[in-house]
């Protein structure tokens, strides 16, 4: 079993993480670090845990006794763990703290997006930083085009996100994060990535959308995306936009594409932003670091679903 600790266990990202880890067959939750809540039960802070056999919150932590540590807050303790990680060389660290990209350039940590860096995460990586929510979906949508050297000029990405996230997103830093990863794939890409954000009606679902100049046919575009994602377990393609309930509560990410005209390609990506760029990506990285199957612990049931009659025809709202 993988002895697992969470720093900042009282945070909302930690709650999402716990809801996955409690059912992960290879994980032993050994530490829930939240000093101000020492001795309290998880169910007194996070809902959905009544009846679950989980340890209480604690203010005592021994990193060397853990196989992996998730950092979910910006506490001084979490930062010190990263700065002094050589003192416990056998412990892996996965950083999904809010301020994780402030000093990333000076850290030896893999960018924790499987769709980009699966090989490096599997082949000996010990430290990973989880992409932000918008970056996770945006890179899944546009990185195949960078792989095939199809990006040119500036890229504007429109984002429809849950209202509580809109004011927390630093669009400049986010643009820099996405640009850096795209340029790693296509060095000739010198454009700027600009982010436009507006709230949607969902509490969990995020959509991103962007237009690029592209003369390829839909069939050619489809082959590109299938070549890139054919052996990935959570990323799928669709010729038409999909409803939020297809992804809500799951690790799935669905890409749709269309040609508004012969020289333009529209890419749209939808995912659960509490999991993508958060707890779901973090557990996905955990599986890779420990050479587990990618889907271990991530067979998640959609949290919103229903029946759609075949005869029903309606356009999907960008804000759905």
Stretch-by-stretch model annotation:
Residues 1-172, 187-191, 258-261, 295-296, ...:
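N-terminal Rossmann-like NAD(P) cofactor-binding subdomain of oxidoreductases
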Residues 8, 12, 136-140, 173-180, ...:
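Conserved active-site and cofactor/substrate-binding residues in soluble primary-metabolism enzymes
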Residues 11, 75, 132, 200-202, ...:
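Short, surface-exposed acidic/glycine-rich loop or hinge patches that mediate macromolecular interfaces
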Residues 16, 20, 140, 144, ...:
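Alpha-helical scaffold segments in soluble metabolic enzymes
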Residues 33, 114, 158, 196-198, ...:
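Residues in well-ordered beta-strands of folded domains
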Residues 124-126, 204-208, 263-265:
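Short amphipathic alpha-helical segments
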Residues 167-237:
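C-terminal substrate-binding/catalytic lobe of Rossmann-fold NAD(P)-dependent dehydrogenases
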Residues 209-320:
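C-terminal active-site/capping subdomain that shapes the small-molecule cofactor and substrate pocket
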